[in-house]
Amino acid sequence: AKTLFPYTTLFRSDCYSYPATLRNELQEQLGTFPLFSFWGPNANIKSTQWIADASIYVDKKYNPTLNLIYLPHLDYCLQKFGNDFTKISKELGEIDQVVKQLVDHFESVGAEIILLSEYGINPVNQAIHINRFLREKGYIAIREERGLELLDAGASEAFSASDHQIAHIYIKDKSKIEKIKREVSTLSGVKLVLDKKEQEAYHIQHQRSGDLILIADDNAWFTYYYWLDDAKAPDFARLVDIHRKPGYDPVEMFMDPKNPFIKLKAAYKLARKLSGFRYLMNVIPLDATLIKGSHGSPFVEKQFYPIFVSSNESEKELEPVDVFDEILKKIF
């Protein structure tokens, strides 16, 4: 997937390929990649189906040695509703049909098949507003623009880059690491706080990792929210805008359920877009309690672990780093 940003400020769906000519070939055969079905409130099976169709097309025409195919569909419903099967049965049926299509094709050409989870998603019911906590402690610097607040990371004593059940806290004055570690350890929902030395045990002591890495309890996850008053939230907070938010925002999958006219508003914005006018699709809520599924903690129950399915029998559990070798065994 790729987004085009022409000077009109409108952005358009596209895809990237190598060689570059494959992009035009795929979009001539299958249509433009449905980016707006890939993420956001309108995320649906269309993007996953396009990826599957493109994979089969490439395999038939070019016969690559290895196909790595990403099917994102369950990422949406499981984060929105957790493992509430009364709410996700439709999505489960849809992905089942796409997987069947792929398996049927690759079995017909004698390929070895692996079904692999990128991660497992477990139920959550608690949002941890780590940047709000750091702000209340006086560590976060805010710049106000047109009455709205922007996080000034460079001027902040400490701030968090949040990602699902993991939060990286970057600290300007290294002498304050222990103090901040003690403070964030008291937060409800925080299971573990790792300094650089402690990160070594989990093999995550990268030079760009946070001075502190926080891991949430099984039922909790970290937001990026830093404002204390929704009226001062930045304009991009209510948009699907993955580039400007200082952290992951799964609430982008929802339209504001508290606004009874939200679908009419979205339709009006879409009409402006289709007419070539500038528009702001500010329909995303600021309610983190909507999220019912997350991932990232290594401490969840085994039923929520990712899976590795192949034709080889095995009794052992795989470590993530073992997957590479398992794939190579299928090739050589």
Regions found by a protein language model. Name each.
Residues 1-4:
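Short, exposed "boundary/linker" segments that immediately precede the start
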